[in-house]
């Protein structure tokens, strides 16, 4: 901490404004906690649902079927109506002992000291760089999240005929986004012998006229300024070229836990998550974690109905499950602050 940094205090600080973070913040305010602050690094609150322009969201929370943006707007409004202070364009740079958070915002650097802190930073897809896919760095390469952000928030079309990599549930969300934007994928690739999702979800490829190539992986990306083609390899090692103008990497979710990894909190390298107890409490009892930043091991995770046990990918919860987890953890935090949590 430097002499120029301001020091502020609150009862509970929540890092992340997705379903888990906002659900927790709302319940804490409704439980009588006075100063609840949500810290969000982006310019809008609501998390991933903000750029998922399709249903179904909100059934568990509001008993209504909503699109992602409408759901995000509703959970933000619910939190604000409860009196939650949502601070945007605010990045936490360090998790300290004693409830100290180092923060940077357009107003400058400061230290926020909270009685309790909830980590609700969520999860992210694995990008091209982490998948070690060689080839051109041309324009037209992105993840589902980036695509949906461009289409639904910025009204931009990054490509017209991409190759889609992966067959997780989010991969088919990507297909829906492509259809809504007038994008026509030329193929969907899956390295395993079966899609990750169950029938009839993978039938979307047939209904949308997208060839589903199983036991096939991407081995190279070709192009100069823009993607022009990809080289793919099948189970026999045969390599061929597909003409396309983009590559869409989907799924392979990993917790957004970079803050935890470099902090004093105990970290599980197997799941890339903070270690928590049955109350969602971290190794430093000032800290809690909820939502997709806490990933169960594959042996402990329940297989969702839309996945096969054989091809179950990294466990990830939907918005409704994260909302529920946020509320449960918030109840534990409220009990902790009152001295009634074991």
Residue ranges and their predicted role:
Residues 2-342:
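Residues forming the flavin
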């Amino acid at each position: 901490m430097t002499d120029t940094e301001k020091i502020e205090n609150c009862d509970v600080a929540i890092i992340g404004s997705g379903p888990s973070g906002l659900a927790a913040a709302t319940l804490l305010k409704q439980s009588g906690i006075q100063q609840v602050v949500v810290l969000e690094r982006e310019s809008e609150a609501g998390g991933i649902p903000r750029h998922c322009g399709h249903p179904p969201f909100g059934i568990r929370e509001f008993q209504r079927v909503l699109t992602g943006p409408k759901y995000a707007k509703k959970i933000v409004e619910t939190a604000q109506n409860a009196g939650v202070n949502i601070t945007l364009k605010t990045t936490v740079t360090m998790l300290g002992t004693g409830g100290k958070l180092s923060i940077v915002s357009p107003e400058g650097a400061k230290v926020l000291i909270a009685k309790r802190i909830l980590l609700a930073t969520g999860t992210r897809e694995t990008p091209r760089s982490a998948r070690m896919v060689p080839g051109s760095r041309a324009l037209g390469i992105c993840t589902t999240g980036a695509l949906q952000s461009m289409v639904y928030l910025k009204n931009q079309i990054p490509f017209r005929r991409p190759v889609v990599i992966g067959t997780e549930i989010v991969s088919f969300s990507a297909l829906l986004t492509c259809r809504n934007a007038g994008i026509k994928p030329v193929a969907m690739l899956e390295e395993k012998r079966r899609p990750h999702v169950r029938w009839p979800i993978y039938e979307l490829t047939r209904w949308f006229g997208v060839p589903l190539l199983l036991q096939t992986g991407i081995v190279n990306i070709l192009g100069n300024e823009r993607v022009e083609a990809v080289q793919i390899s099948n189970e026999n090692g045969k390599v061929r070229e597909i003409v396309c103008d983009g590559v869409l990497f989907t799924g392979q979710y990993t917790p957004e836990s970079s803050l935890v990894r470099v902090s004093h909190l105990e970290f599980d390298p197997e799941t890339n998550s903070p270690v928590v107890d049955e109350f969602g409490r971290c190794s430093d009892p000032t800290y809690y974690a909820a939502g997709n930043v806490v990933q169960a091991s594959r042996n402990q995770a329940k297989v969702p109905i839309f996945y096969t046990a054989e091809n179950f990918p990294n466990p990830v919860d939907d918005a409704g499950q994260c909302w529920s987890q946020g509320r449960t953890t918030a109840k534990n935090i409220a009990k902790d602050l009152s001295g009634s949590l074991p």
